Amino acid sequence: MHHQWLLLAACFWVIFMFMVASKFITLTFKDPDGYGAKQEPLILTAVTKVEEARVPEEKHWTKEFQPTGKAFTGNLLHHPLVHMERLELLRNVCRDTALRNLSHTAVSKFVLDRIFVCDKHKILFCQTPKVGNTQWKKVLIVLNGAYSSIDEIPESIVHDHEKNGLPRLSSFSDSEIKKRLNLYFKFFIVRDPFERLISAFKDKFVHNPRFEPWYRHEIAPSIIRKYRRNRMETKGLQFEDFVRYLGDPNHRWLDVQFGDHIIHWVTYVELCAPCEITYSVIGHHETLEDDAPYILKAAGIDRLVSYPTIPPGITVYNKTKVERYFSGISKRDIRRLYARFEGDFKLFGYRVPDFLLN
């Protein structure tokens, strides 16, 4: 009898240790940065499937470069799971009542003007400047049949919306708009919100490669008059002035004065209404090398056109550059800027820039 009790106790101990080990393994493979309270060990399954597919090239991204903050390695960035996760995050943030004022907007003419239509292949593309939109416009121009290849399209035509053959969604009747929004493949591209603002500032107020004089001669002086603290400073628009303008809760009156030129720095929410329009895919500038082929395939056009070659390193998030531009700007002004763009950070999974805010 004594031996039977010892055997029973030993069996119980083995079972108990097995249960503890199983629980530990499950916890180990849970995603530590998951957005919801309930976590599932999904990553292990996904990794196994991708390895079986033998993706030819693996790129390793640090956490800083992961747009959604999840623990995906480079060889998973083109995987459908990533894009499902982005859309799930978007839906969850859209439902957050605390962020409603930062995540929702009416589907106005301003929004419909941003969306370009390719009826031939049933595609809608929402323009978000400073994230490589010129190349996507070229893709759609070719698909619409205006040119046979991207290389043939003159740069002047791409931005001439009267001649490039890309109608805006706003040009259709209400019933036609509704039909296209319900049935067409819809996408847009985002990037780190603060890095996008730096790009807009450089492109419009520093280099101005398209020779658009109104940015320097009309918009810049208006911002300087209202937001420059040192009235003795005679330089052109500085990034600090730009940040104060964008972070001012009363910026709307200047936005109205500037008209459609504000598309280069207003929020993604204001441009594309992502909580009101159900988009099929949201690409990220930081992972565009993987996202562009995925979008083409998801839209069913990957055999008809290719996304132009991306120069090495051009889409990589540059923390050093961001720190350099924001150095010398008060924490108060940076926090006010973040308060305006918080919806963009949360909706698309970009990390809070604590290195600037604190």
UniProtKB/Swiss-Prot annotation:
<dbReference type="GO" id="GO:0016051">
    <property type="term" value="P:carbohydrate biosynthetic process"/>
</dbReference>
<keyword id="KW-0808">Transferase</keyword>
<keyword id="KW-0333">Golgi apparatus</keyword>
<comment type="function">
    <text>Catalyzes the transfer of sulfate to position 3 of terminal glucuronic acid of both protein- and lipid-linked oligosaccharides. Participates in biosynthesis of HNK-1 carbohydrate structure, a sulfated glucuronyl-lactosaminyl residue carried by many neural recognition molecules, which is involved in cell interactions during ontogenetic development and in synaptic plasticity in the adult.</text>
</comment>
<dbReference type="GO" id="GO:0030166">
    <property type="term" value="P:proteoglycan biosynthetic process"/>
</dbReference>
<dbReference type="GO" id="GO:0008146">
    <property type="term" value="F:sulfotransferase activity"/>
</dbReference>
<feature type="topological domain" description="Cytoplasmic">
    <location>
        <begin position="1"/>
        <end position="6"/>
    </location>
</feature>
<keyword id="KW-0735">Signal-anchor</keyword>
<comment type="similarity">
    <text>Belongs to the sulfotransferase 2 family.</text>
</comment>
<dbReference type="Pfam" id="PF03567">
    <property type="entry name" value="Sulfotransfer_2"/>
</dbReference>
<keyword id="KW-1133">Transmembrane helix</keyword>
<dbReference type="InterPro" id="IPR005331">
    <property type="entry name" value="Sulfotransferase"/>
</dbReference>
<dbReference type="InterPro" id="IPR018011">
    <property type="entry name" value="Carb_sulfotrans_8-10"/>
</dbReference>
<protein>
    <recommendedName>
        <fullName>Carbohydrate sulfotransferase 10</fullName>
        <ecNumber>2.8.2.-</ecNumber>
    </recommendedName>
</protein>
<keyword id="KW-0472">Membrane</keyword>
<feature type="binding site">
    <location>
        <begin position="129"/>
        <end position="135"/>
    </location>
    <ligand>
        <name>3'-phosphoadenylyl sulfate</name>
    </ligand>
</feature>
<keyword id="KW-0325">Glycoprotein</keyword>
<keyword id="KW-0119">Carbohydrate metabolism</keyword>
<keyword id="KW-0812">Transmembrane</keyword>
<feature type="transmembrane region" description="Helical; Signal-anchor for type II membrane protein">
    <location>
        <begin position="7"/>
        <end position="27"/>
    </location>
</feature>
<dbReference type="GO" id="GO:0000139">
    <property type="term" value="C:Golgi membrane"/>
</dbReference>
<feature type="topological domain" description="Lumenal">
    <location>
        <begin position="28"/>
        <end position="358"/>
    </location>
</feature>
<feature type="binding site">
    <location>
        <begin position="191"/>
        <end position="199"/>
    </location>
    <ligand>
        <name>3'-phosphoadenylyl sulfate</name>
    </ligand>
</feature>
<dbReference type="InterPro" id="IPR027417">
    <property type="entry name" value="P-loop_NTPase"/>
</dbReference>
<feature type="glycosylation site" description="N-linked (GlcNAc...) asparagine">
    <location>
        <position position="101"/>
    </location>
</feature>
<feature type="glycosylation site" description="N-linked (GlcNAc...) asparagine">
    <location>
        <position position="318"/>
    </location>
</feature>
